[in-house]
């Protein structure tokens, strides 16, 4: 249960995150936020690890899957199938982001039963794009990394934001030069 105090803290953290992203962007000399902000290999709530998705999106863009594991190839094929279904020529970045957002909210449920992870139990992964796209269920980290994968595949800047205190993750997506929480 989220209390009013927790909501105020979360809003304050969101404002802090936006300011931090802007400061990182300025200190990096432009749009290099992703290079200086750590978003991968971060453990959330001691249970979920934010995994990198760049290798999969790079394979999508280049058409070269030779460096991908079988699991990553499977993830790529599932993600590509979704994009082929919802993205059309001539869409703006905003329209692409909105199409992905709508698809995810309509097709991926929140798996509250997986809030406690049993170490070594990978029977129903809900914290990574492969499991999310296969099972159509996710926890926040799964939503965030899957959304980021789609954005990377579409060439739209996106990063996973994490709050270790509240054990929560979400995305920042850059549209028309501005960062937005998603």
Protein language model regions, located:
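Hydrophobic/aromatic-rich core segments of domains that either
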Residues: 141-182
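Sec-dependent signal peptide cleavage junction
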Residues: 15-29
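Active-site rim recognition segments
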Residues: 49-55, 127-131, 174-182
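Sec-dependent N-terminal signal peptides of Gram-positive bacterial secreted proteins and lipoproteins
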Residues: 2-18
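Secondary-structure boundary elements
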Residues: 65, 71-132
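N-terminal low-complexity, Pro/Thr/Ser-rich intrinsically disordered segments
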Residues: 34-75
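Alpha-helix capping and helix-loop boundary segments enriched in small/acidic/polar residues
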Residues: 27-30, 70, 135-138, 162
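Conserved active-site-adjacent core of cysteine acyl-enzyme catalytic domains
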Residues: 118-138, 142-149, 153
């Amino acid at each position: 249960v989220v209390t009013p105090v927790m909501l105020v803290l979360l809003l304050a953290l969101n404002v802090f995150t936006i300011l931090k992203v802007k400061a990182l962007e300025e200190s990096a000399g432009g749009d290099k936020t992703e290079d200086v902000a750590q978003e991968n290999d971060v453990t959330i709530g001691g249970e979920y690890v934010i995994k990198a998705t760049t290798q999969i999106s790079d394979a999508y863009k280049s058409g070269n899957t030779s460096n991908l594991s079988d699991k990553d190839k499977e993830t790529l094929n599932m993600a590509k199938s979704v994009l082929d279904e919802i993205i059309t020529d001539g869409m703006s970045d905003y329209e692409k982001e909105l199409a992905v957002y709508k698809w995810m909210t309509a097709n991926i449920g929140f798996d509250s039963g997986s809030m406690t992870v049993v170490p070594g139990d990978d029977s129903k992964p809900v914290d990574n794009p492969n499991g999310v796209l296969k099972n159509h269920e996710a926890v926040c980290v799964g939503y965030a990394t899957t959304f980021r994968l789609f954005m990377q595949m579409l060439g739209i800047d996106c990063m996973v934001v994490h709050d270790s205190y509240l054990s929560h993750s979400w995305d920042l997506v850059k549209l028309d030069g501005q960062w937005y929480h998603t």
